[in-house]
Regions:
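Conserved N-terminal phosphate-binding loop of PLP-dependent enzymes in the Aspartate aminotransferase
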Residues: 1-129
Length: 129
């Protein structure tokens, strides 16, 4: 089974495809670093993560009990995007065959979900303002 999988990867040039789309993935992920909730954005190939911060200027994290990461994950899911919250980090890992258009859709939904989470953070009084 593993050898057949490797054969398919080679026939379909999956690694070459990842090389072609990973730049766009990284650019779209880095654009979200400008969002008020995001303190850090990082990517390697088609894996990426956003670290959510209470205060991005001072890199102050939210309290674990605030559950901002799970709240953002829930909003992503409600909007049709599956991500994984690991604490207050949102992990993105699309299929290796994803297209530039699908990457745009992923990050458009992520941005909308972050906006909704930012509103929720304000409503919950989780920021000192």
């Amino acid at each position: 089974m593993a050898l057949e999988t490797l054969k398919i990867y080679e026939e379909r040039d999956v690694v070459g495809h990842v090389r072609n789309v990973m730049g766009h993935f990284g650019e779209r992920l880095q654009k979200l670093a400008e969002h008020p909730l995001v303190g850090n954005a990082r990517a390697c190939g088609l894996m990426g993560a956003l670290e959510l911060m209470k205060d991005k200027a001072t890199k102050t994290p939210f309290e674990a009990s605030d559950k901002v990461g799970p709240a953002a994950e829930g909003r992503c899911l409600e909007n049709g995007l599956i991500v994984r919250a690991i604490g207050d980090n949102l992990a993105f890992c699309p299929p290796l065959i994803t297209t530039d258009a699908e990457i745009d859709e992923i990050f458009d939904i992520a941005e909308k979900s972050l906006d909704e989470t930012e509103k929720w953070v304000g409503e919950q009084g989780l920021r000192d303002t």
